[in-house]
Design a protein with these regions (language model features):
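Short beta-strand/loop segment at the start of cytosolic alpha/beta domains
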Residues: 1-8
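Amphipathic alpha-helical interaction surfaces in cytosolic regulatory modules
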Residues: 15-90
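A charged, well-structured terminal subsegment
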Residues: 91-104
Length: 104
């Protein structure tokens, strides 16, 4: 299995927290070629958070990093991302192992 840096996004992903998460993901990306964003603990996600999430993913892609996104089927983040039909842009995985395999 690929050695991946995992970033647990916990709590709200919104205008007030996006910069902190961008910094955390940037730090993780500096240590690994594969980054997994685990949204399991996200309990609030607004439009600024969705925009920030895709800005983070675009930055990883621009750096040539592989990435996976964990958003369990019954989680809050998954429901919103599906309502917005964003799973057509990024694959949402059920587990970290699945996300790591998907990123490989």
């Amino acid at each position: 299995m690929t050695q991946a840096a995992v970033v647990d996004l916990v709590g709200g992903l919104d205008l007030g927290s996006v910069a902190r998460w961008e910094a955390e993901v940037g730090k993780a990306a500096s240590t690994s070629g594969t980054v997994v964003l685990d949204l399991t603990g996200v309990d609030f996600l607004d439009s600024a958070g969705v925009h920030g999430l895709f800005r983070i993913l675009a930055a990883l892609d621009g750096q040539g990093k592989r990435f996976g996104v964990v958003a369990p089927r019954h989680g809050r983040a998954r429901r919103l991302l599906e309502i917005l039909d964003l799973q057509s842009l990024v694959r949402l995985c059920e587990s970290r192992d699945e996300a790591i395999d998907d990123a490989a």
